[in-house]
Amino acid sequence: ETRYEKFLRQHVDHPRTLGLMGHRYCAVMLARRQVTAPGRPCKPSNTFVHAPAEDLVATCTRPADATGFHSTSTPMDITACRLRGGDTRPPCNYRARQLHHHVRVSCLDGLPVHLAGTHAS
C-alpha cells in the first residue's frame, strides 16, 4: 500500500457511505477501513472527506502555506470523528460531526499523503 493509497483508505469516503447514522458512521467506517484494529489503541481522531479523490489531488497543485500544507480552494463536506472520553483502549467510541470545511493536506510527488486538519475559512 502506497502512502497515497493509505490516505485514500483512511480519509476519503465519496460518495458518503449511506445507512450509517451519526456516531455509528465513525465506528463502522474506522473498523471497515482498518483505521482502528482489534488489539490496537483507538485513534484519537480521524476525518473522512466526502469529495472525489481527484479534488484532493488537485489541492497539491495549489501553493503551500508557511508550514508546507496545501488547502482546498473550496470547503468540502467532511465527517470529523473524535474519540469520546479520551480512553484509547477498545472498544472505541466516537463522536461524529458533519462539517463543511477546507481540508489541509501534505503532498508527496503531487499526491496527498497526510490530512493535516480542516478549517472553516
From Swiss-Prot:
Q: Name one Pfam family in it.
A: RnaseA
- Reported EC number(s) for this entry are 3.1.27.-
Disulphide connectivity of cysteines: C26-C81, C42-C92, C60-C107
Localization of this protein: Secreted
Task: Provide the top EC class.
Answer: hydrolase
Q: Name one GO molecular function term.
A: RNA nuclease activity
Instruction: Give the annotated active site.
Output: H11 (proton acceptor), H114 (proton donor)
The record's listing under CDD domains reads: RNase_A_canonical
Name the residues that bind substrate.
Answer: K6, R9, K43, P44, S45, N46, T47, R82
Q: Which SMART domains match?
A: RNAse_Pc
Xref: Gene3D superfamilies = Ribonuclease A-like domain
Q: Name one GO cellular component term.
A: extracellular region
Known SUPFAM superfamilies for this protein? Answer: RNase A-like (SSF54076)
Q: Which UniProt keywords apply?
A: Disulfide bond, Endonuclease, Hydrolase, Nuclease, Secreted
For this protein, the record's PANTHER family field holds: ANGIOGENIN-RELATED, RIBONUCLEASE
Q: Which family does it belong to?
A: Belongs to the pancreatic ribonuclease family.
Function text: Pyrimidine-specific nuclease with preference for C.
Q: What is this protein called?
A: Ribonuclease CL2
The organism named in the record is: Gallus gallus (Chicken)
